């Protein structure tokens, strides 16, 4: 297994990226793998990474959050992101991981690595925490604000295969995000997509409302990127608000502090459940190789989780399974 890693992408790069790589390789001390850290050699070396399985690939440019994505990918040929994507295109790496500019990662993936034949619109897909602890794969959350009904079918197939082979769910339950659970609910897109999803080679269980998205009753939720991104931001905001409110209440007086001390193990588990860092990054599905978008504010734990996610996708040959499913379709 070989991973190309954009060492300069993200708010805390390259330190968080290098520290995440350290944690990742430490988890697999005896496993054969090759990791390519792409970026500023001097800065990367300053964090003391010493593992024969890690190679630093020099890149003199950085694509920042202020750069226009497509223009940056075309003009900054020696940027860490573009060089990493080229490694995947040339077959020197099996997957790409980056915490950098989302739009630039999408552009590099499309223009350099390329789309899977038959997939018109790739989808960005994180895993949300659920009440049951199993997680739910949601796609699309922003790669494409608009979509056709046929695209949602592609999302369902890709999400189902990912949930099965990466999340370990035997028969993933696929649902369509909607404003009601009845089959006739929704706008023109959801009404057109519903019967197509019923005929798709997935275990489609109908519509799901946003309030039930994290119940654990479904394993995959499909939607267009506009609604998906609103759902994502709502979940992130609600989780953040909940943790802040709990912290405020449990530190308000001595009795509350004692209660927090007693409940500390359970509170820690709750925090881990809601912590995006534990769930890896968002997979960009529909690309010719696994591409993982780590959160821009990723720390070492989040990077390690994203690398694990990429490893599982490579180990289980998820992209090839998607290609075969589309060929049959």
Curated annotation (Swiss-Prot):
Signal peptide: none annotated. Its EC number is 2.3.1.274. Catalyzes the reversible formation of acyl-phosphate (acyl-PO(4)) from acyl-[acyl-carrier-protein] (acyl-ACP). This enzyme utilizes acyl-ACP as fatty acyl donor, but not acyl-CoA. It catalyses: a fatty acyl-[ACP] + phosphate = an acyl phosphate + holo-[ACP]. InterPro entries: FA_synthesis (IPR003664), Phospholipid_synth_PlsX-like (IPR012281). Keywords: Cytoplasm, Lipid biosynthesis, Lipid metabolism, Phospholipid biosynthesis, Phospholipid metabolism, Transferase. This is Phosphate acyltransferase. Disulfide bonds: none annotated. NCBIfam families: plsX. Pathway: Lipid metabolism; phospholipid metabolism. GO terms for molecular function: phosphate:acyl-[acyl carrier protein] acyltransferase activity. Belongs to the PlsX family. The gene is plsX. GO terms for biological process: fatty acid biosynthetic process; phospholipid biosynthetic process. One of its GO terms (cellular component) is cytoplasm. It is an enzyme of class 2 (transferase). Pfam families: FA_synthesis (PF02504). Its main location: cytoplasm. Homodimer. Probably interacts with PlsY. It is found in: Cytoplasm.
């Amino acid at each position: 297994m070989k991973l190309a890693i954009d060492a300069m992408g993200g708010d805390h790069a390259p330190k968080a990226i290098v520290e995440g790589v350290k944690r990742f390789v430490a988890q697999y001390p005896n496993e054969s793998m090759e990791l390519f850290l792409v970026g500023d050699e001097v800065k990367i070396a300053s964090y003391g990474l010493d593992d024969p399985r890690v190679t630093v690939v020099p890149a003199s440019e950085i694509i920042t959050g202020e750069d226009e994505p497509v223009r940056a990918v075309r003009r900054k040929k020696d940027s860490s992101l573009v060089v990493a994507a080229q490694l995947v295109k040339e077959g020197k790496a099996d997957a790409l991981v980056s915490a950098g500019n989302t739009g630039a990662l999408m552009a590099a993936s499309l223009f350099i690595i390329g789309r899977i034949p038959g997939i018109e619109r790739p989808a960005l897909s994180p895993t949300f925490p659920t009440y049951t602890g199993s997680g739910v794969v949601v796609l699309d959350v922003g790669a494409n604000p608009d979509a056709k009904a046929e695209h949602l079918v592609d999302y369902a197939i890709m999400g189902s295969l990912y949930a099965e082979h990466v999340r370990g769910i035997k028969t993933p339950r696929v649902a369509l995000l909607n404003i009601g659970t009845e089959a006739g609910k929704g706008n023109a897109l959801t009404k057109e997509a519903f019967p197509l999803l019923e005929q798709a080679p997935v275990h489609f269980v109908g519509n799901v409302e946003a309030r039930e998205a994290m119940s654990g009753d479904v394993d995959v939720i499909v939607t267009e990127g506009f609604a998906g991104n609103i759902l994502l931001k709502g979940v992130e905001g609600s989780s953040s608000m909940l943790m802040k409110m709990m912290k405020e209440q449990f530190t308000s007086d001595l009795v509350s502090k004692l209660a927090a001390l007693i409940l500390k193990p359970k509170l820690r588990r709750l925090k881990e459940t809601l912590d995006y860092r534990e769930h890896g990054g968002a997979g960009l599905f529909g690309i010719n190789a696994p591409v993982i978008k780590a959160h821009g504010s990723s720390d070492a734990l989040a990077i390690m989780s994203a690398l694990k996610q990429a490893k599982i996708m490579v180990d289980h040959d998820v992209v090839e399974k998607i290609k075969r499913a589309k060929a049959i379709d």
